[in-house]
Structure formats: C-alpha cells, structure tokens
Amino acid sequence: MADPDSYRSSITSRPAFNRTVTSSTQNYGTPASGNRVLKIVTETHTSSVASGLSPYGQGAASTIRDDREREKKEITELNDRLASYIGKVRFLAAQNRKLEADLNVLQSRFGKSTGSVKIMYEMEITTATNVVKETGKDHEEAEKEIGKIKDQLDELRKKFEEAQKGRAEDRLKIDELLVTLSNLEAEINLLKRRIALLEEEVARLKKENFRLTSELQRVRSELDQETLLRIDNQNKVTTILEEIDFMKRGFETELKDLQAQAARDTTSENREYFKNELMNSIRDIRAEYDRFMAGNRNDLESWSQIRVQEINTQTNRQNAEINHKRDEVKRLHSQVSELKSKHAELAARNGLLEKQLEDLNYQLEDDQRSYEAALNDKDAQVRKLREECQALLVELQMLLDTKQTLDGELKVYRRMLEGNSEENGLRQLVEKVVRTSAINEEVDTETMRVVKGEHSSRTSYQRSAKGNVSIKEVSPEGKFVILENTHRDKEEPLGDWKLKRKIDGKREIVFTFPSDYILHPVQTVKIFARGNGVANPPEVLVFEGDDTFGAGANVQTILYNNSGEERATHMQRQSQQTTTS
C-alpha cells in the first residue's frame, strides 16, 4: 500500500482510455454474525485505437495506462488482504488467546490501510473535480473559439459573395469585351473589303493610266506627223514661191523683151499702148499672185493654228487627266497605307484584348480556387473544433462516470469499515469473530459492469499558396513531398528556396533547392527522402540530409523563397474522438 503522504493522483485532463469496471460480490461468513456481503471492485481498461494517436501523444497514453494498472494492482492487493484478514479471523476462532494478539495487529494494520485508501480516493475525487472544472473552462474557450471562427467564416462567406459578384461583373466585362472584339473584327473585315476595292480601283486606274499614256504617245506621234506635214507644206510653199520667182523672172524677161520690141516700135501710140497693156498684165498677175499667196498663207496659218490649238488642248487635257490620276493614285496609296496601319493597330489591340481576356480568366480561376480553399479550410477547422468539443464532452462524461464510480466504491468501503444500523462493519465483525466460533457462509452471484469504448482519430489537411507554386502532396510517413507549378506558361525559378517541415513543434527538417533549379509550367517535382527514391532531375530530387521528412500528429510543411518569404504551406493535424456504448 502506498504512503498517503507521497501519493500523487494519476487523473489528468482528457485521458484517452475507457474504464471497464468488474464488480464481484462474495459472502464471507463470520461467527455469530449472520449473512455478510463483501463487494470487491476490480478495474480493467480497454482502448481500441481506430487510427493515429491522441493529440497528447503515445507517451501520455502509456503513462495513464501505467497509472491505472498500478491502481488496479493496489485495489486487487487491498481485496486480497481483506480476504486474508477474514481467513485469519476464521483461523483465530479456534485459538482465542492467540487471536486476541493477532486481532490487535490486524486492527492496526487494517485501519491504517483503509485510511490510506480513503485519503487516496479523496485525492482522486479532488483531482477529478479540478479536471472537470478545467475541462469546463476548455469547453468555454472552445465555444469562444468556435464563435470567432464562425465570424471569420461569415466574413469569408461575404468575401466569397463579393468574389461571386466580382466574377459576375468580370463576366459582364468579358461579354462587353467580346462584343467590342466582334465589332473590331467586323470593322477589320470591312476595312479588308475596302482595301480590296481600293486595290481594284488602283488596278483600274493603272490600266486607265496605261491607256492614257498610250493615247498620249499616239497624239505625240500624230503631232510629229502634223509637224512633218507642216514642214512639208512649208517646203511646198517655198517651192511655190521659188516657182513664182522663176515665173516672175520669166515674166520680167518677157517684159523686157516686150519693152525692147516696144522700143523698136517708133510710134508713141504703140509704145503707150503696149506699156499700158504690160502694166495691166503685170498688175493682174501681181494681184492674182497676191490673192493666191494670201489665200494659201491664211489657209496654212489657220490650219496650223487650229492643229496646234487642238494638240495643245488635247495635251493639256491629257496632262490634267494624268495629274488627276496621279493625285488619285497618291490619295489611294496614302489611304491604303493609313488603312494598313489602322489594321495593324486594330490587330494589336485585338491581341491585347485577347491577352487581357485570358489573364482575367486565369485570375478569376485562381481567385475562385483560393476562396474555395479558404472556405474548405475554415469548414474543416469548424468541424475539427466541433469534434474536439464533442470529444471533450465525452471525456467530461467519462470523468463524471469515474467520479460516480469512485463515490460508490468509497461508500462501499465506508460501509465495510463502519457498517450501518442493520449490519455490522469489519471492525464489529472482527470483535464478534473473537467471541464466537460459529461460521455461516452464503455465496451470492457475481455482478459485472463493463464500459466499452473506442478511440478514433481523424487526420485533416490544409493547403495554401501565395503564388504559382503550391505543395500538392505530402507523404504522412515522411517519404516524399510533391510541389506543383500551377501556371500554364510561366516558369518558376526555385533556386536556393527552402522546404521546411516541423514535426509536433519540436523537430525541424530543411531541404534547399539547387541554385539553378527551375520548375516548368504545369509541372511537378517529387522530393524523396534519402533511400526512398532515385533522383531524376528535374522531375525527381532526393534529400540527402535525412532518410525521412518526419511523421507526427501535428506536421507543418512550409516553402520559403530565397528572400525568406513564406510562399506555400501544408498543414497536417490529427484529432481523436472517443465513443462509448
């Protein structure tokens, strides 16, 4: 039996065990005492773990089991000693004198032992009461925490609703951008058709220009022909003038002959007559010549002027048309260049709008995943707190049951020691045994009360990321860690990044990426602990610093960049639930 001064209670908060109480009743008859029922209480403990350990670890569970085994042995020893006392009383019935001496020893030893048991159970009751109070405080704190988490959940729901509204607005904006894009595409098609029409017009103008150039060449050839004809006519005029001069010289020669003949004529009348006739003939010839020359000169000058005027007019008109066509061609060229530049600008704007649309879609998907992950994490935390509250309630009920059982056992021991109005206690029983030798025995049936229970553990995971790189998967046994680049076309340099893994807030394991390591878009990298995989960069890396990343009930895996900023996290927690039947 333990010393009551050095006894320490083994009751702690949130014990992870179930109590099975076996109660057996034996009747030990005593001389001249009638029927006496002695209730011996034996405690056994059963604990079936569905998965994992309690949050307090295997060490706490082992300590609780050892304490309960020690208490069970102490109670069993107490029951055995009580039985030996009764046997000794029966043996001392035949030897009254010897029994008197032994009775004094037994009374001293028995009274001391029962006093120790009483002190121990009172300490157990006090400890259990304190544990119940602490559990109640923990329950109140858990309720407050649940209220805070509910507020956070409401805030996240509001943010999610705002995100949904923003998503709807983004969809409207996307629709507007699609309408604008359609209008731009229609305008581009219209401009392409206009450019085609203008190119056809340019081709037509080029043909017309070629035709006008050919016409100009033809007119120039005609002008050359007319010039040659004019020169020919001028040559003809010169020839005619020479003929006239020749005829004039002939006429003058003939006139001189006539004058000579007239000079030979001696009569004045004949000379006057011939002279007059000659003058008249000369005058007529000169007048006729002047008329002929004037007519030819006027006709030639008028015809030349008309032809020159027609050629000049036609040339001016053709030059004006050519200049007009050139201006038109220049205008069309400038318009085509302007349309091409506008087409290039619209094409660039179209590409920019498509890029913005794609970025908005990616951002919308990332925001939606982030909000869904945050809501899932908060729901998981709420469920976990509710499960912990339920487990606390179950443990509180177990403590209350334990307290009631201990109260019942104390009442039994008090009744065994003190007795009641109808029955005698052990003290009176021993006194009567000394004075009588009659022994009556009666055996009652044994009763048993079993409390069965089962512990079930639940593991929850929580992930978060502040960029494109996230922790996709972590082995619960600590064999590997998988990272993923969620971006579709952007590479992520992970040179000198650190992957830290904290085990139950104590042990810390750090893996550092190579300085030139790059994680490609939509790719994963699997990092094995030493001895668990073969290196195959860049898809598979091996951590040579340890043969495991560690395992435990509360594990944090955190990814830091080369500046020490936290970029991604992965939380693993285990919660235990106790069920009784």
UniProtKB/Swiss-Prot annotation:
Stretches the record annotates as Linker 12: 259-276
GO molecular function: structural constituent of cytoskeleton
Record keyword NADP present: no
Domain IF rod, chain residue ranges per copy: 71-424
Residue segments, region Tail: 425-578
Ranges of compositional bias, category Polar residues: 7-33
Region span, Linker 1: 107-120
GO annotations of cellular component type: cytoplasm; intermediate filament; nuclear envelope; nuclear lamina
Residue ranges of the region described as Coil 2: 277-424
Record carries keyword Cytoplasm: yes
Coil 1A: annotated segments: 75-106
Major location (coarse): cytoplasm
One biological process term in Gene Ontology: protein localization to nuclear envelope
Region (Disordered): 1-33
UniProt cross-references to SMART domains, sorted A to Z: Filament
Residues covered by region (Coil 1B): 121-258
Keyword annotations of the record: Coiled coil, Cytoplasm, Intermediate filament
Function: Cytoplasmic intermediate filaments provide mechanical strength to cells. Essential protein, involved in attachment structures in epidermal cells that connect muscles to the external cuticle. Required for epidermal morphogenesis in embryos. Probable component of embryonic epidermal attachment structures.
Family statement drawn from the similarity comment of this UniProt entry: Belongs to the intermediate filament family.
Assembly and interaction partners: Forms some heteromeric filaments with ifb-1.
Protein name stated in the entry: Intermediate filament protein ifa-3
This protein's encoding gene: ifa-3
